[in-house]
């Protein structure tokens, strides 16, 4: 979290997007406090001011591995110790891969989207980093990745991909995925039509092509018809995904 919803740090360039209270209630609703299953760690204001509005721009994890920038957390030493205690309560030790400010400054970390990458577990064992091309083209970000690979730790491969279409739309690599680990029974309980497949992609594309305007100008934003068109599109998307009446206007 960034800070309390009821406080604004003095001299802050940007407001935090995650409030302590919101993060706390998420952990409560998911019953994560039992047995020390949750740790609330505050983002460093320096990272937020550098453009890391979401912490996945300066830290990324997979399994027991956390890769992070030295300036990602407020009171880093205390945050790391709290994390170690929580992991110890779950009978495992975290592997911490830290980029110091000397080897990679915050501007380089944010610009390269190094920590916005994905760490995946390989079927053959070990892990791989999937990164945007920007990380490869930023010399010190690339040097950090090379150092991680050379340590003979769990991350054994690095793959750089062209994700500039996503970057131009204002999102980094993390905007292309959201991973939720589920058991077989949990997966079976999900509305099957919410799982993306070829048929679902085609149906969603048809809604977009049929309902979305191909450009928006100031006059469009003042056009009452845009509201009706947007609601029609949302209603059709809800039908494609089998969501039912999830929006207020659908229940009128």
What is the predicted function of each stretch?
Residues 1-252:
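The feature marks the mature, well-folded catalytic cores of soluble enzymes
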């Amino acid at each position: 979290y960034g800070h309390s919803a009821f406080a604004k740090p003095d001299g802050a360039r940007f407001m935090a997007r995650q409030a302590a209270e919101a993060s706390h209630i998420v952990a409560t609703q998911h019953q994560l406090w039992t047995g020390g299953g949750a740790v609330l760690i505050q983002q460093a204001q320096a990272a937020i001011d550098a453009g890391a509005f979401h912490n996945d721009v300066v830290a990324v994890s997979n399994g027991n591995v956390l890769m992070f920038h030295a300036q990602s957390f407020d009171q880093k030493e205390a945050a790391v110790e709290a994390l170690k205690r929580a992991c110890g309560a779950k009978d495992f030790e975290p592997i911490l891969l830290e980029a110091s400010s000397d080897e990679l400054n915050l501007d380089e970390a944010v610009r390269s989207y190094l920590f916005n990458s994905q760490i995946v577990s390989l079927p053959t064992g070990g892990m791989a980093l999937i990164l945007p091309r920007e990380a490869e083209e930023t010399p010190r970000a690339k040097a950090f990745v090379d150092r991680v690979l050379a340590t003979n730790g769990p991350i054994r491969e690095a793959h750089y991909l062209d994700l500039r279409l996503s970057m131009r739309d204002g999102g980094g690599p993390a905007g292309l995925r959201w991973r939720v680990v589920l058991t077989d029974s949990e997966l079976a309980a999900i509305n099957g039509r919410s799982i993306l497949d070829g048929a679902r992609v085609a149906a969603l594309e048809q809604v977009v092509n049929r309902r979305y305007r191909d450009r928006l100008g100031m006059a469009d934003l003042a056009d009452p018809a845009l509201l009706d068109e947007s609601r029609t599109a949302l209603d059709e998307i809800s039908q494609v995904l089998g969501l039912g009446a999830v929006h207020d206007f659908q229940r009128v």
